[in-house]
A protein has these predicted regions:
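The feature represents the membrane-entry module of six-transmembrane cation channels
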Residues: 2-565
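Intrinsically disordered, low-complexity serine/threonine-rich segments
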Residues: 555-582
């Protein structure tokens, strides 16, 4: 069935049909090493797709994009394949010597196979090399019950304790935390201070659909730009700049409030308004945008300014789609969950008794771990500390990337280039601002160094702290840069007006504030006077539900997106697992 596609080191195991060989293999390899690689999971996904396309009949009806449930895949694919290979687990069939565990995957078995693989492959931590997943790690043709007699010594527990990362896979049917084994894994994560993340599916198809829906707005903007250039409509262009500012602010605020439809409208209006100035020349734009240089440098800055704002609205639309997906995953993780693992169940009475005995009187602590995960999308010691101090963590694990990507990418490179030009061509290009703006160089250098330090710190932090850092940057830069600089954009006082100078200093030094909170982290921020309120500001997101949200179904039904979605072969949702198959 696998067409001999496995790596060569697994071939000697193919003809070992004896149960005792499989038992000895699993005894020889530590349970925490019953792992697969990213490539193994992609191979598993492709093989299941292949057998479906070849006409294998599964014992249930299923949607092609989701695939059959894991229960059915286990019975009709995993068991037969591993039985033919020698009755070892699928993981040891692929990697007979085992692999060190980096990632522990929790799921609930009722999820559909392509939901599971899509979410795990999309959310796989980039530093993780190997993953432990019960359906592929445990030998499904052997006596699994014998492995679970002591929950604390089960393969689940040993693998989780060895892992660096933990991923919970929601599904569209029921919360994984209605399963007691999944609750027990949350207990183990609490005991060993693991960070738990929620897996989510790929959003590239939805993002592509959203960009296609923005194409008419782009055409409208370009058309208005042509008309304005021909007619020299300066007053009208100033109105368009005002619309751009309003759309930019609406896009930022609506994402922080979870107003997805308002965000959609703002991104369309913003893209149309900025597209007007793609056609017009730079001198017209520079009447309303203050540029500290002259000549070709000024023209280059004008064009980069326009392009950055144009790119912002495209990235903001990706953020909107991602935010909506995160909301849907949060809802899936809460489906039928009754607020405590006291109500969770086990398929085996013996397992339930053993698990509840091991958790003992720490049920409330486990419930807090799960509650933080349900609210934030991430559960960690730092976030739990914030939660216990009364910080609202709703969707704290979601970050807006549009602002950080711009200020840490093209705008940072632009700043470095301007500093280089200022130093090399001080007598020629920099004279206009050197006379009236002598502090430009030290302020700009401070801004650049702060952002570089932020990037270095970001690479060394855990995922929960990284989310906090990006949220800090998005909110502080939004407040200090976008809003105030947009006010300056509409001013008539020229670049060297007092307002422009103040705004430049505030924008540049705002990155020192960002770096300050990044160094403190979540726990350090909580210790500051008013720390709870600051953490609330940085972490929380006001979510307005109801008719303001665009659903995935609405996206799929739109004519612009129907062709893109019709080509989709993998989607959606999955859950967390330690429940053994019977």
């Amino acid at each position: 069935m696998l067409d001999g596609s496995l790596r060569s080191e697994t071939v000697p195991l193919w003809h070992r049909g004896m149960t005792d060989v499989a038992i000895e293999l699993h005894k020889a390899v530590h349970p925490a090493r019953w792992c697969i690689t990213f490539a193994d999971l992609k191979f598993f996904q492709s093989e299941v797709r292949r057998v479906i396309q070849d006409g294998m009949t599964f014992q249930e009806n299923f949607e092609a994009s989701y695939g059959p449930s894991m229960y059915v895949v286990n019975e009709q694919y995993i068991k037969p394949v591993t039985a033919a290979a020698g009755k070892m687990s699928w993981a040891l069939m692929m990697n007979p010597d085992g692999l060190d565990c980096d990632l522990f995957i929790t799921h609930a078995w009722q999820e559909d196979v392509f939901e599971f693989t899509d979410k795990v492959l999309t959310s796989w931590p980039w530093r993780a090399r190997h993953a432990w997943c019960c359906m592929l790690a445990n030998p499904q043709n052997l006596d699994i019950g014998a492995l679970l007699q002591s929950p604390s010594m089960s393969p689940f527990a040993l693998a989780l304790q060895s892992s660096k990362y933990m991923l919970v896979v929601p599904n569209r049917h029921k919360s994984v935390y209605t399963r007691l084994w999944c609750g027990y894994e949350a207990y183990l994560a609490f005991q060993s201070n693991k960070i738990i993340r929620t897996a989510s599916p790929s959003i590239w198809r939805e993002a592509l659909c959203s960009w296609l829906r923005m194409f008419p707005a782009l055409l409208v903007g370009l058309t208005i730009g042509v008309v304005s250039k021909v007619g020299q409509l300066d007053l009208f262009l100033q109105f368009i700049l005002t619309m751009r500012m309003i759309a930019l602010l609406a896009s930022l605020v609506s994402q922080h409030c979870g107003l997805m439809r308002l965000c959609l409208v703002a991104n369309h209006v913003g893209l149309a308004s900025i597209s007007v100035f793609i056609i017009t020349d730079g001198t017209l734009w520079s009447k309303y945008v203050h540029i500290p240089f002259s000549g070709m440098t000024a023209l280059l800055l004008v064009n980069i300014h326009r392009i950055c704002i144009w790119v912002y609205f495209l990235l903001a639309e990706v953020d909107r789609v991602n935010c909506q997906t995160e909301m849907e995953e949060a809802e899936a993780l809460q489906k039928q969950y009754q607020g405590s693992i006291r109500h969770a169940s086990c398929s085996e009475v013996r397992d339930e008794v053993n698990i509840r005995h091991e958790i003992g009187d720490q049920v409330d602590e486990v419930d807090k771990v799960i509650q933080v995960l349900l609210k934030a999308g991430i559960s960690s010691d730092a976030l739990r500390a914030a939660y216990l101090q009364g910080v609202e963590l709703r969707h704290a694990g979601f970050v807006q990337l549009a602002i950080p990507v711009l200020v840490l990418g093209p705008l940072l490179l632009l700043g470095c280039g301007l500093v280089g030009q200022y130093i090399v061509l001080l007598d020629e290009a920099a004279d206009p601002i050197a006379e009236v703006y002598p502090f430009w160089l030290p302020v700009q250098c401070t801004s650049i160094l702060a952002r570089l330090a932020f990037l270095c710190l970001f690479c060394r932090r855990s995922i929960d702290e990284q989310c906090f850092m990006l949220n800090v940057m998005a909110k502080i830069v939004t407040a200090f840069y976008v809003f105030m600089l947009e006010l300056s954009t509409l001013g008539n006082g020229g670049f060297c007006s007092e307002l422009s100078i103040v705004l430049f200093i505030v924008y540049s030094l705002s990155f020192l504030v960002v770096l300050f909170f990044a160094v403190l982290g979540i726990r350090g921020t909580l210790k500051l006077p008013g720390g709870r309120q600051l953490a609330q500001f940085f972490l929380s997101r006001l979510v307005v539900s109801g008719n303001w949200r665009l659903s995935r179904t609405q996206l799929e039904s739109s004519p612009e997106c129907s062709e893109v979605f019709s080509q989709s072969t993998g989607d959606a949702s999955d859950s967390s697992g330690s429940e053994s198959s019977s």
